[in-house]
């Protein structure tokens, strides 16, 4: 028989058993899994910082005026197994029907090799946005595959690396058209057959920007002067229209043509780029990404090359590295909010990278022939069903790809019959039904759908006699996806190895700490991720009847209550599917609140100069005038400047946007006074929730005077960053702003599952395509809060504060921390000021960031919020060992800088200026540097045991923006420049033998 001694040895052996079963039933185990340092390490770190407990450290950092005096009103934490069992009960309340609703969402098969090796793989889902090119080559290659896929299928010249959803992409297309069109009109024409959710978002976006929408038929568009038009192709009812004449007419008047389309349909029908479209948007969801009750899915935008400097969102481009080899990087970043602020093309920050990677690999796996087979099979199923229904005397649309539009029927009776058979159809009105088929449809599904209409379908017989239903004049003739990457990896082994090769090129949290300030790269626990792929969450259509998603309703209600308790607000919307959209929703709420009080004049938004770029970009989208507030020498909001400008704009003040703790990494003592000043002049206070990881369980913004915040569930509440998305940015408000949260689409669903009319009278439109945004990843945050419990959440915040101060303290002899609060402490992040070092040594913050790659680290945030600095946020999930590894690397780098200062290393030919160093460089036959290979690649002995090799040397940013290329690299570009020389040496060696 085994005893405890079989599992314990030496100092770890327990001298006596625990006293009771209650002690052994340790329900708080997950807290210790999530928080990196154990209690012994916490005590050691506290001694370094100079405090004897987490409580005393918290009291020293967090101002007393805002500090919570009572614990969060949340249950105690539970184990992973208990939480999974609890959420399984919730999931089982959802009813998974076969959904043929369509409206932009379609059934799909996620290839299992993609499910396991991307969606369930932390090498992909724990990565950050690829700002640091050298350690992001793998996911950027996947994203350039996505861009190539979208550009090829739409017939356009360039595409971005994903947007939040199709409706948001359409709104962005409208803004792009407004910026770029020659026409000075304020009118944007919208096809009356776009998806309803798209029209809702267009209405939300247009009004604050002074854009006038007109909805009508394509024929009516010929009669008006517009700066742009949006067409749906195929349209929401499945019809495939010929819009060539209309496109020519719009162009003749100086307008642009935007098209919302379907990537799978475009394998068969003429792509919009070939008949006059300037911009094409859509959703890549049906390329292997489940419904997810609305998301997350990767929207996309493709456009003509002349608009590349105005296209919103991330854009992956091709440059060269220091050795002249091809390398990927984020291209044309000066378009983006983190640089251009209120002048940016968009407020988009987080996009949908993980889902874009999945969609791109779906195309890689199937290739052009596989996609054609899927598209033709889907179309044949639809054509056979249409033939059967017509044969029974029903009226069905003539031309379509996958969606049948059936008119002149008792739609309610059909809808109910389908529901009784476990199927969802789209009830357009009392006399119209829509049926959208997809790659998951089988012959038995077609038979069952026919039976709903009382029609017997002989699939085999109808297949033999039924013609296709695509218009002959709009059949695609052009090739697509011709690059070798889409024609190589079609066996599972090949794709598996390709995915592994790409993942190995990158640094994600499965390999190292990612100490990015303002990004909160914390543990995304496996238990939190598991429910995401359950079919009860993944396979619910976002427009399914209410009675089918009571499990989701419970989960959403419970999560909203949890977040309200954590923040001190009164109401919350989970609809925003990014932090930027949460900001947008919050500012729209403020705007609508003022207008409801007859104060339309209030349009000034005060923003500190240290704010994240999304703040002014979001304010601009809401039609607000941005006025900048100075910061004082300590990095805090200059209260005198705030007071002066609040008085100056008292009659027009709408809001103050403030981040707390500040983007400078400190708890500002004057935050309550700041709120009082703004309120005294009629404004509302918007607190950016980006730094909520320093507040949960410690302070509540809704209690110190803030009126509204967005949260980042992909930061504070553990949804993974996915390499640049997905994210969820809930908007939380005080009670007086609750009526102005985003509206939702009416859904079918009374007690019997019959359609009922929505009754919500919202004053603010939708900000995302789906009512609950990226609903399928909400279980991640629910699991995190449930397992941590009230005490665990508070401890997580306290350890986040400790870890940041531990790093600042240990590095104090070597690097100056730019800003501190009282007692010389920082919040959950610290800014390391290296500007004085650069003046003496020539070594910049960027050089340090690149050198950290040689140590196996992702760099801290570079030059934000202060140019020439590094902002470090370690999060509570990092152990003391990992923190010390980072500190040791930074100390070694400081030693190298000192060697440059003393003349021991060359000012240019040194390991910092030449970093990072690739394996190819280090192992080359010639080493032309004045420092050793050992110093280049193994500056610390620990690296001999675990070494990350960057796949490329330092990437040339200037070259990349001068030579913009945003599609797959031609294979010949990879040919090594030195191949012939190496071959000559090999032949010379052979001749000697």
Swiss-Prot record:
GO terms for cellular component: cytosol; glycine cleavage complex. Its cofactor is pyridoxal 5'-phosphate. GO terms for molecular function: glycine binding; glycine dehydrogenase (decarboxylating) activity; pyridoxal phosphate binding. The modification N6-(pyridoxal phosphate)lysine is found at residue 715. Keywords: Oxidoreductase, Pyridoxal phosphate. One of its GO terms (biological process) is glycine decarboxylation via glycine cleavage system. Its EC number is 1.4.4.2. It comes from the Bacteria. Pfam families: GcvP2_C, GDC-P. It catalyses: N(6)-[(R)-lipoyl]-L-lysyl-[glycine-cleavage complex H protein] + glycine + H(+) = N(6)-[(R)-S(8)-aminomethyldihydrolipoyl]-L-lysyl-[glycine-cleavage complex H protein] + CO2. The glycine cleavage system is composed of four proteins: P, T, L and H. The glycine cleavage system catalyzes the degradation of glycine. The P protein binds the alpha-amino group of glycine through its pyridoxal phosphate cofactor; CO(2) is released and the remaining methylamine moiety is then transferred to the lipoamide cofactor of the H protein. NCBIfam families: gcvP (TIGR00461), PRK04366.1 (NF003346). Belongs to the GcvP family. PANTHER family: GLYCINE DEHYDROGENASE (DECARBOXYLATING), MITOCHONDRIAL, GLYCINE DEHYDROGENASE, DECARBOXYLATING. This is Glycine dehydrogenase (decarboxylating). The gene is gcvP.
């Amino acid at each position: 028989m085994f005893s405890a001694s079989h599992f314990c040895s030496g100092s770890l052996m327990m001298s006596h058993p625990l006293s009771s079963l209650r002690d052994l039933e340790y329900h708080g185990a997950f807290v210790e899994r999530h928080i990196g340092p154990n209690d012994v390490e916490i005590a050691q770190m506290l001694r370094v910082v100079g405090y004897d407990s987490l409580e005393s450290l918290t009291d020293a950092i967090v101002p007393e005026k805002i500090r919570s005096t009572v614990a969060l009103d949340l249950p105690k934490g539970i184990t992973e197994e208990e939480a999974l069992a609890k959420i399984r009960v919730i999931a089982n309340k959802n009813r998974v029907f076969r959904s043929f609703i369509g409206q932009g969402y379609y059934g799909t098969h996620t290839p299992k090799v993609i499910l396991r090796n991307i969606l369930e793989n932390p090498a992909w889902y724990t990565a950050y946005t690829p700002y640091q090119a050298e350690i992001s080559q793998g996911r950027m290659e996947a994203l350039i595959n996505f861009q190539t896929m979208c550009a090829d299928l739409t017939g356009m010249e360039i595409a971005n690396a994903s947007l939040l959803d199709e409706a948001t992409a359409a709104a962005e297309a409208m803004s792009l058209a407004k910026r770029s069109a020659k026409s000075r009109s304020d009118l944007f024409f919208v096809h009356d057959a776009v998806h309803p959710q798209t029209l809702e978002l267009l209405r939300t976006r247009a009004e604050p920007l002074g854009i006038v929408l007109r909805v009508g038929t394509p024929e009516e568009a010929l009669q008006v002067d517009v700066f742009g038009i949006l067409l749906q192709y195929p349209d929401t009812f499945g019809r495939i229209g010929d819009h060539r004449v209309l496109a020519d007419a719009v162009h003749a008047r100086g307008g642009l043509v935007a098209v919302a389309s379907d990537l799978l349909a475009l394998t068969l029908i003429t792509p919009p780029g070939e008949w006059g479209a300037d911009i094409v948007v859509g959703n890549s969801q049906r390329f292997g990404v489940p419904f997810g009750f609305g998301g997350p899915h990767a929207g996309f935008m493709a456009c003509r090359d002349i608009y590349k400097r105005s296209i919103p969102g991330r854009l992956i481009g091709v440059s060269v590295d220091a050795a002249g080899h091809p390398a990927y990087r984020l291209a044309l970043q000066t378009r983006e909010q983190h640089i251009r602020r209120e002048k940016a093309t968009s407020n988009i920050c987080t996009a949908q990278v993980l889902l874009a990677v999945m969609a791109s690999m779906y195309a890689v796996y199937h290739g052009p022939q596989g996609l054609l087979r899927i598209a033709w099979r889907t179309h044949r199923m639809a054509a056979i069903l249409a033939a059967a229904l017509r044969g029974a005397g029903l009226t069905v649309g003539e031309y379509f790809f996958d969606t049948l539009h059936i008119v002149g029927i008792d739609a309610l009776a059909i809808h109910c019959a389908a529901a009784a058979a476990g199927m969802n159809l789209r009830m357009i009105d009392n006399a119209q039904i829509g049926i959208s088929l997809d790659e998951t449809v089988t012959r038995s599904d077609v038979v069952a759908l026919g039976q709903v209409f009382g029609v017997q379908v002989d699939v085999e017989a109808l297949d033999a006699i039924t013609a296709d239903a695509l218009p002959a004049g709009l059949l695609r003739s052009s090739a697509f996806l011709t690059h070798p990457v889409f024609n190589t990896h079609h066996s599972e082994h090949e794709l598996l190895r390709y995915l592994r090769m790409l993942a190995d090129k990158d640094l994600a949290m499965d390999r190292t700490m990612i100490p990015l300030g303002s990004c909160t790269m914390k543990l995304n626990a496996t238990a939190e991720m598991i429910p995401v792929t359950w079919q009860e969450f993944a396979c619910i259509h976002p427009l399914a009847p209410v009675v089918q998603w009571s499990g989701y309703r419970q989960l959403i209600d419970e999560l909203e209550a949890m977040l309200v308790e954590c923040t001190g607000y009164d109401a919350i919307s989970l609809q925003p599917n990014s932090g930027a959209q949460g900001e947008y929703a919050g500012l729209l709420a403020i705007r609508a609140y003022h207008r409801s009080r007859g104060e339309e004049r209030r349009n000034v938004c005060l923003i500190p100069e240290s704010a994240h770029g999304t703040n002014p970009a979001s304010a601009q989208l809401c039609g607000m005038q941005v006025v900048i507030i100075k910061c004082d020498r300590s990095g805090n909001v200059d209260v005198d400047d705030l007071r002066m400008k609040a008085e100056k704009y008292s009659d027009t003040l709408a809001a103050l946007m403030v981040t707390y703790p500040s983007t400078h990494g400190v708890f500002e003592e004057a935050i309550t006074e700041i709120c009082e000043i703004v309120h005294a002049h009629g404004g509302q206070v918007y607190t950016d929730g980006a730094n909520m990881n320093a507040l949960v369980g410690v302070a509540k913004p809704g209690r110190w005077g803030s009126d509204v915040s967005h949260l980042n569930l992909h930061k504070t509440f553990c949804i993974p960053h996915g390499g640049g998305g997905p994210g969820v940015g809930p908007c939380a408000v005080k009670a007086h702003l609750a009526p102005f949260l985003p509206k939702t689409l009416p859904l079918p669903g009374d007690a019997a599952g019959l359609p009922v009319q929505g009754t919500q009278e919202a004053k603010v439109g939708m900000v995302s395509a789906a009512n609950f945004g990226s609903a399928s990843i909400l279980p991640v945050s629910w699991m995190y809060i449930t397992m941590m419990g009230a005490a665990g959440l508070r401890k997580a915040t306290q350890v986040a504060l400790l870890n940041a101060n531990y790093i600042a303290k240990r590095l104090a002899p070597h690097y100056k921390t730019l800003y501190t609060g009282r007692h010389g402490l920082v919040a959950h992040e610290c800014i390391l000021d290296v500007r004085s070092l650069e003046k003496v040594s020539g070594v910049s913050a960027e050089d340090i960031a690149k050198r950290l790659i040689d140590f196996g680290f992702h760099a801290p945030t570079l030059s934000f919020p202060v140019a020439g600095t590094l902002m470090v946020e370690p999060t509570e999930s990092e152990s003391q060992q990992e923190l010390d590894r980072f500190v040791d690397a930074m100390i070694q780098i400081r030693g190298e800088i000192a060697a440059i200062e003393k003349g021991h290393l060359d000012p240019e030919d040194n390991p910092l200026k030449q970093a990072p160093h690739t394996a190819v460089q280090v192992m080359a036959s010639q080493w032309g540097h004045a420092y050793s290979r050992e110093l280049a690649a193994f500056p610390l002995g620990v690296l001999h045991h675990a070494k990350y090799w960057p796949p490329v040397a330092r990437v040339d940013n200037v070259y990349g923006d001068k030579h913009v290329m945003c599609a797959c690299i031609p294979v010949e570009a990879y040919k090594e420049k030195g191949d012939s020389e190496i071959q000559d040496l090999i032949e010379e060696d052979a001749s000697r033998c």
